Each structure stands twice: as structure tokens, then as C-alpha cells.
């Protein structure tokens, strides 16, 4: 079962890159053998990003030219397992990835709980146009399934933030919070939908009956719902060099601390604790001076690479 995102194609703007986010839960026993041909087709077409392969399917985000992305997607859909693959598109003003990585994993999204299978049991999908009504219902408890560094820059109004460091911590958070049963409806959301596939399956397994999740995730909501009708506050963290997007999937104003990979606001950049590529308000006090000197050396290499018109792989 996959979260059926509607593909929305936009006219290509010169100088922009097409970004395609995708996932598909399917029994895929030959996933290890598929790694090399998938890597090769991406490399041959100048496509970069990360794709994860596992027994349970595929997950990832890639970017490239319109033609390059179309070729890779056609290759994927030519496989019997991915004939029904649906992807989500957005744009980037610069290539948002440094390289192309196809990785073999135990799970395409890591929860670490055995026997959770979204192909068999999953929550009820809610279209973006119906989401506001659901989360405004006093009988609904809204839960953000993302990590703390993501929720720090944007959330839905009234959502409960588990403040997890990784998705692996989510099941334990649920088990430790008996009060979650106090409301009859549970509404869950994440960036693009994949974490909610497993999170809602887990909630159903834990005995929650009315479990809903936002179809297409925050990204689909930001694409379809105009700002004046939106219950979203802030920006949505994305796992590439854009760092964040806002309504209409426009690139946000956040940057990334290359020391700790946390998103930074313009206010964070003005902090005396911020040193580009070395430290920020989130990590300054957790790093030793030896760490910071190592980061400074890396930052100098990044600056030199930029002057040569190249991109340093450590950036």
C-alpha cells in the first residue's frame, strides 16, 4: 500500500531543478540486486539524491532535470513491484543534493518494531482539504510524528509534539503516554506521509480505533491549501539543501548548521555562538574546541572549493 499522492507537474523554470519525493510499500525480495541498476540509471541521467531499498519497498527523494527525473521514474515504474509508484514534485533553485546514493536498509523508514506492516493495516487517509475540520474537532488529538529539529521550525496549530530525536523513539513515547486514549480520534501527520504509514499501523496495533493521517503529508497540504486558510504555522523541514519549504512549496529562509545538521533561522545566524560550518546555538556547548577546529578546517576547504566553482562533499 502506498500513500496515494497526486503528482502535480509545473512548467519548468529555467535554472530550476525538479525534485521528486517517492515511497512505495511492497514485498520486494530482490531489493539487493536492484541497487546497482538503479544507481546506474540515476548516474547516467545526472540525477542526485538518496533512495532506500528494503524488503518492504522503496523510499527517497531525487533531483535533476525534467528529462532525467522522468527517465528514472519510468525505469522504476517498469519494474512489476513499482508499476503503481506515485511521486510528489517540487522545485529547487539549485541542485539540493551533492551526490546520488542508493542504499540497502532493513526498513525504508526505521521504526524498529517487528510485524508492523502498512500493506496490511494502516490509518484512514484524510485529504488536505478535509484536514482543517478534523484537527479543529475537540474530539481529535493531533500528533506530530516528526523529530524535534523538524517540529522546531513548524507545526500544525494545537499539535502534540513528542519531542523525539529519531522515529525509533516514537513507539516508546506512545507506550509511555496512556493519556493518548482520552480522546476518541487520533490525527497524525509527517513531512510526506511515509512515517505516518507505520505510525498509524502501530497505533492501530496498540488498540487505537479511530486513527487518521494527512494524505501526502505536510508537503501536500502546503501545496494545496492557501495561506489564508492554513492551520500550519512556520516552515516544513526537508531533508535536502533547501532545508525548508513554505506554502506553495516555495523554498524557506532556513539554513543548515553543517556541524550538527540542525535548521537555523535568520535570528540564529546573528547569535554570537554561530560560526558558519563550525557551531550554532544548538550545538556550540556540546562540542569541544578540538571538534570546532576540525570543523574550521573543513569549512576552509568548503570555501576554497566554492572559489574554484566546485562543491565540497563535506558541505
UniProtKB/Swiss-Prot annotation:
It catalyses: uridine(34) in tRNA + AH2 + O2 = 5-hydroxyuridine(34) in tRNA + A + H2O. GO terms for molecular function: oxidoreductase activity, acting on paired donors, with incorporation or reduction of molecular oxygen. Residues 136-230 form the Rhodanese domain. Signal peptide: none annotated. CDD domains: RHOD_YceA. Gene3D superfamilies: 3.30.70.100, Rhodanese-like domain. The active site is at 190 (cysteine persulfide intermediate). Pfam families: Rhodanese, UPF0176_N. SMART domains: RHOD (SM00450). Keywords: Oxidoreductase, tRNA processing. PANTHER family: RHODANESE-LIKE DOMAIN-CONTAINING PROTEIN 7-RELATED (PTHR43268:SF3), THIOSULFATE SULFURTRANSFERASE/RHODANESE-LIKE DOMAIN-CONTAINING PROTEIN 2 (PTHR43268). This is tRNA uridine(34) hydroxylase.
Amino acid at each position: 500500500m502506498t500513500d496515494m499522492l497526486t503528482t502535480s507537474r509545473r512548467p519548468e523554470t529555467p535554472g530550476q531543478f525538479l525534485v521528486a519525493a517517492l515511497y512505495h510499500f511492497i514485498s520486494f525480495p530482490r531489493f539487493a540486486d536492484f541497487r546497482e541498476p538503479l544507481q546506474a540509471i540515476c548516474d547516467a541521467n545526472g540525477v542526485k539524491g538518496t533512495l532506500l531499498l528494503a524488503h518492504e519497498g522503496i523510499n527517497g527523494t531525487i533531483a535533476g532535470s525534467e528529462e532525467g527525473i522522468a527517465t528514472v521514474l519510468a525505469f522504476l515504474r517498469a519494474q512489476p513491484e513499482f508499476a503503481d509508484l506515485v511521486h510528489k514534485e517540487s522545485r529547487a533553485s539549485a541542485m539540493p543534493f551533492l551526490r546520488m546514493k542508493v542504499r540497502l536498509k532493513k526498513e525504508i523508514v526505521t521504526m524498529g518494531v517487528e510485524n508492523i506492516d502498512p500493506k496490511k493495516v494502516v490509518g484512514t487517509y484524510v485529504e488536505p482539504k478535509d484536514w482543517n475540520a478534523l484537527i479543529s474537532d475537540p474530539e481529535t488529538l493531533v500528533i506530530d510524528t516528526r523529530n524535534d529539529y523538524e517540529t522546531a521550525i513548524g507545526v500544525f496549530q494545537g499539535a502534540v509534539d513528542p519531542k523525539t530525536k529519531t522515529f525509533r523513539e516514537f513507539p516508546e513515547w506512545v507506550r509511555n503516554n496512556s493519556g493518548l486514549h482520552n480522546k476518541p480520534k487520533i490525527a497524525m501527520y509527517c513531512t510526506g506521509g511515509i512515517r505516518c504509514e507505520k505510525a498509524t499501523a502501530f497505533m492501530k496495533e496498540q488498540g487505537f480505533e479511530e486513527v487518521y493521517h494527512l494524505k501526502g503529508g505536510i508537503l501536500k497540504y502546503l501545496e494545496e491549501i492557501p495561506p489564508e486558510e492554513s492551520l500550519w504555522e512556520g516552515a516544513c523541514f526537508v531533508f535536502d539543501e533547501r532545508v525548508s519549504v513554505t506554502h506553495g512549496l516555495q523554498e524557506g529562509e532556513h539554513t543548515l548548521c553543517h556541524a550538527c545538521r540542525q535548521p537555523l533561522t535568520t535570528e540564529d545566524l546573528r547569535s554570537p555562538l554561530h560560526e558558519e560550518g563550525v557551531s550554532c546555538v544548538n550545538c556550540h556547548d556540546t562540542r569541544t574546541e578540538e571538534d570546532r577546529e576540525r570543523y574550521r578546517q573543513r569549512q576552509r576547504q568548503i570555501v576554497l572549493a566554492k572559489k574554484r566553482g566546485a562543491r565540497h562533499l563535506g558541505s
